[in-house]
Amino acid sequence: LSAKDYKTLLQEYVQHYHSGELEYKVIGMSGPDHKRVFTMCVSIDGVVYGFGDGGTKQEAGQNAPQATLELLNRDNV
């Protein structure tokens, strides 16, 4: 799967199994300006399920839903 597919898959998962709101939020930045690392979390109904890091907000925003889906599939939440 491409990274973009994880966002779509998570959206479909939430629509099918949850009735709540899916939210992505940047929760941290670290590193120097030329090598910044962004950390993003994914929450469903206000409950945080996964985190993702990346050199850009977009990269972190692609890694976070992947980690969330892995957690949800592992725990069958």
Q: How does the language model describe each region?
A:
Residues 1-77:
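Double-stranded RNA-binding/processing signature
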